[in-house]
């Protein structure tokens, strides 16, 4: 594995509950832009990161694996001085945050997967594998993936914009290498049985990372798991239903028992 990297990131809020958010395969950290204006920034502080090969880390060398991504996330938490934190991961980022849990379970307060890739990977039939593998060099493949995973209901302008962002803010070689890791690696034995509270949020219009798949994986592996299906949403909840996503995720994070301690500590006088 290559040396850890301090991931490019932006901080939002100054709340006592620290949260690290990791993007998915088809976007950099700007994937979270639609939700940023309406987050509870008094209760939480969010670090939104770019993984290697994306955004400001587009030219960063690496193995482009979920394990390396997890090591990078932990290095960032160390740099920020965050001993305990919650994690949010979208799609591929859901696999990365589960890797963080596997590597440092004592540091994770709560785990959120937004249409998360299971820790068992996502085996694809040959024709789908060809579509996904070819997406590195063929923008039209990315468009088909975006359209299919949002139920074929999103406007052409949005699909075109998402493809442009994906191509402009990712390195093609890194993009292709990430696929082998998140789709092909199975590490679920390292997180199975973890007592961490774990929320999976899925969209009813997403045929790939569906509620059915999460019931067979996430809900079986995490004893303290919750599953929420957003009815008018596909794979990209941050774009499709941002306010619903914020409410579901922040209600879940706010239920953490340590939040009471955080509030008391913040209000304590020297």
Regions found by a protein language model. Name each.
Residues 8-59:
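Conserved HGGG/HGGXW glycine-rich cap/lid loop of the alpha/beta-hydrolase fold
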Residues 68-84:
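Conserved acidic catalytic loop of the alpha/beta-hydrolase fold
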Residues 87-89, 114:
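Short beta-strand immediately N-terminal to the catalytic nucleophile in serine-hydrolase-like folds
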Residues 122-123, 138-193:
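Conserved alpha/beta-hydrolase catalytic His-Asp/Glu region
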Residues 199-233:
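Conserved loop-alpha-helix segment in the C-terminal half of the alpha/beta-hydrolase fold
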Residues 224-270:
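Catalytic active-site module of serine/aspartate enzymes centered on a nucleophile-bearing elbow/loop
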């Amino acid at each position: 594995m290559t040396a850890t990297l301090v991931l490019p990131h932006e901080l939002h809020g100054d709340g006592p509950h620290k949260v690290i958010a990791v993007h998915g395969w088809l976007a950099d950290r700007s994937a979270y832009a639609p939700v940023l204006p309406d987050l509870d920034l008094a209760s939480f502080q969010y670090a939104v990161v770019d993984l290697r090969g994306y955004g400001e880390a587009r030219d960063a060398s690496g193995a482009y694996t979920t394990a390396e991504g997890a090591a990078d996330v932990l290095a960032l938490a160390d740099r920020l001085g965050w001993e305990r934190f919650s994690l949010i991961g979208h799609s591929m980022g859901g696999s990365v945050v589960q890797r963080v849990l596997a590597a440092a379970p004592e540091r994770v307060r709560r785990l959120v997967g937004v249409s998360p890739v299971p820790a068992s990977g996502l085996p694809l039939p040959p024709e789908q594998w060809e579509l996904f593998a070819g997406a590195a060099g063929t923008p039209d493949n990315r468009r088909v993936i975006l359209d299919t995973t949002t139920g074929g209901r999103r406007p052409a302008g949005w699909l075109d914009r998402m493809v442009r962002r994906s191509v402009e803010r990712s390195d093609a070689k890194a993009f292709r290498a990430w696929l082998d890791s998140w789709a092909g690696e199975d590490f679920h034995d390292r997180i199975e049985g973890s007592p961490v509270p774990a929320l999976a949020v899925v969209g009813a219009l997403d045929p790939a990372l569906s509620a059915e798949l999460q019931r067979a994986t996430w809900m079986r592996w995490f004893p303290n798991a919750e599953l929420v299906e957003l009815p008018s949403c596909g794979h990209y909840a941050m774009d499709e239903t941002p306010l619903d996503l914020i409410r579901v995720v922040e209600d879940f994070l706010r239920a953490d028992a340590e939040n009471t301690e955080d509030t008391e500590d913040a209000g304590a006088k020297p």
